[in-house]
From Swiss-Prot:
Heterodimer composed of 2 chains; the small (or glutamine) chain promotes the hydrolysis of glutamine to ammonia, which is used by the large (or ammonia) chain to synthesize carbamoyl phosphate. HAMAP family: CPSase_S_chain. Belongs to the CarA family. PANTHER family: CARBAMOYL-PHOSPHATE SYNTHASE ARGININE-SPECIFIC SMALL CHAIN (PTHR11405:SF4), CARBAMOYLTRANSFERASE FAMILY MEMBER (PTHR11405). Its main location: cytoplasm. Keywords: Amino-acid biosynthesis, Arginine biosynthesis, ATP-binding, Cytoplasm, Glutamine amidotransferase, Ligase, Nucleotide-binding. This is Carbamoyl phosphate synthase arginine-specific small chain. It is found in: Cytoplasm.
Amino acid sequence: MSQATFEIKNGPSFSGYSFGADKSISGEAVFTTSLVGYPESMTDPSYRGQILVFTQPLIGNYGVPSMEARDEYNLLKHFESSHIQVAGIVVADYAAQYSHWTAVESLGDWCKREGVAAITGVDTREIVQYLREQGSSQSRILVEGSDTPKFYDSMATHLVAEVSTKETLYVPAKNPVANIAVIDCGVKVNIIRSLVARGANVTIFPHNARIQDVAGQFDGVFLSNGPGNPETCHETIENLKELLANEDLQQLPIFGICLGHQLLALASGGKTHKLQYGNRAHNIPAMDLTTGQCHITSQNHGYAVDPQTLPQEEWKPYFINLNDQSNEGMIHTTRPIFSTQFHPEAKGGPLDTMPLFDKFFNNIECYKTHLSQSSYRMVSQIPAIDKKEIMA
């Protein structure tokens, strides 16, 4: 292993050893307290441009499964996207020897193959304590013998444009009951799986697609998760504003998760703010304000919606974080639209809130019933969609 250093801008440095790619990188340092699921976390597009610090001390002990494995819908079985999305990882104790029946390579070999920096042998407890007190910080992993990059503010970059699909994709259901449009801001594979498994033919659009022009072809619209500052997604926000203002689609069901929740809030006139160190874990309690029930949720976000800035006659808070009291969801007062900051489809993580997908499909069923009782589909002219089947 080469000598390596984890360096925080205007903060401490930590000496260790590289077990990933022989290159230095920079990015925003964030941490996750999740105990398992490092393959899913590292391939989650929401982590794009970030250096992920694991609080779990032993990482890599069950290796990395095959990227070739597919499920019954031909979606990736073990990962949230087809490549590692994090800029680098920081672990206390890397397990070079791994053991799991699905594993085909070590975490270190995977990082080397994907060109991702990785450092071990550092005190992650001290790093996380610093990040909790000072907030998520610009940082670098410096590997001996490689060029030194400048500190990079990934949050000032339009990261969604990097991870969103460049063409319209299509994932068919075996027994379809609905057609759903997904705005891909960095959508996780398990979100697509959660929709298709419930009978949705899913059409995945680029983040800047004019969804307002084709929404009339669909029974519902889903706004996906994704990386970075939501305010950089100007095109998506403007498109959503037009969609929400369309008088012919006032009853179209819409569901947003994570960044999709934030973009829906911005399109509705609300504001977002950056959290000091974000919420990234599999065990965060959130209360459903409509029932008073508490659910354990999986989260990965550095920004939050300010519910006080939403139009109060149209929106009300849906969920609240019981740790820091931040907003975790909102629901429209008269239309079938709702969103959550957390991930109901958690992989890994708890499945307490998976029924929110069922709520979305119930809204779709009501919408389809409403349309069947009308004499026409309430959009005058809809352009054709050129789409490619399969999601890599």
